[in-house]
């Protein structure tokens, strides 16, 4: 079955800041979406406003919707088809209260050598796009658990100790892992 060509009217721009970025464990999904024509890489971007980017259980990254706190967060921008967006929403647990998808303002970061995909259309220098934030049900506790400390980019250093979903205890839900993490003593 063929895919319709993605057009600006049929795509959603999505900002990725964690494990969906190139070089991280969930980027395989972005690669699949690019191969199937359901996503295209648009460039390296940074949030216009400062936001806290923190790690939760198993070094999973979370963007907290607290504009003005934290740093300008670095990440990657993708144009995603409706089918691709559905797959991202599933990964991020939108219907299960894991993350919420909301708008965020971005600015293009300095040019970086492109590794995959092509820039089919010129990417905007600044724009409002969608991002996956920590769900409101645990956002404040996650911020307190991190003692108000955050970082501006999810790098190999922040990802050290990351545990893939299939390697985590399977008898607990994602939200159970978060509840345990936020109630545990800080390092």
From Swiss-Prot:
Q: Which residues form the active site?
A: 92 (proton acceptor)
Annotated GO molecular function terms are:
acyltransferase activity; gamma-glutamylaminecyclotransferase activity
Keyword hit for Acyltransferase: yes
Q: Which UniProt keywords apply?
A: Acyltransferase, Transferase
EC class name: transferase
List, alphabetically, the InterPro entries matched: AIG2-like_dom (IPR009288), GGACT (IPR039126), GGCT-like (IPR013024), GGCT-like_sf (IPR036568)
- Give residues annotated as binding substrate: 17-20
Stated EC number for the protein is 2.3.2.-
Q: What does this protein do?
A: Putative gamma-glutamylcyclotransferase.
UniProt record similarity statement: Belongs to the gamma-glutamylcyclotransferase family.
Q: What is this protein called?
A: Putative gamma-glutamylcyclotransferase At3g02910
Naturally occurring in which organism (per UniProt): Arabidopsis thaliana
At the highest ranks, the source species' classification is: Eukaryota, Viridiplantae, Streptophyta, Embryophyta, Tracheophyta
């Amino acid at each position: 079955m063929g895919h319709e060509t993605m057009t600006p009217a049929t795509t959603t721009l999505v900002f990725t800041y964690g494990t969906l970025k190139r070089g991280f464990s969930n980027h395989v999904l972005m690669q699949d979406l690019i191969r199937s024509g359901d996503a295209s890489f648009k460039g390296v971007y940074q949030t216009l406003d400062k936001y806290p980017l923190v790690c939760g259980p198993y070094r999973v990254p979370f963007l907290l919707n607290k504009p003005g706190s934290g740093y300008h967060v670095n990440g990657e921008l993708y144009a995603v088809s409706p089918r691709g967006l559905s797959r991202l929403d599933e990964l991020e647990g939108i219907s299960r209260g894991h993350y919420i998808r909301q708008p965020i303002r971005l600015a293009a970061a300095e040019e970086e050598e492109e590794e995959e995909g092509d820039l089919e259309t010129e990417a905007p220098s600044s724009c409002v796009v969608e991002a996956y934030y920590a769900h409101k049900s645990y956002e404040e506790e996650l911020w307190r658990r991190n003692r108000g400390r955050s970082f501006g980019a999810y790098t190999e250093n922040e990802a050290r100790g990351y545990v893939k979903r299939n390697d985590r205890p399977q008898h607990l839900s994602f939200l159970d892992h978060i509840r345990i993490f936020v109630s545990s003593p800080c390092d």
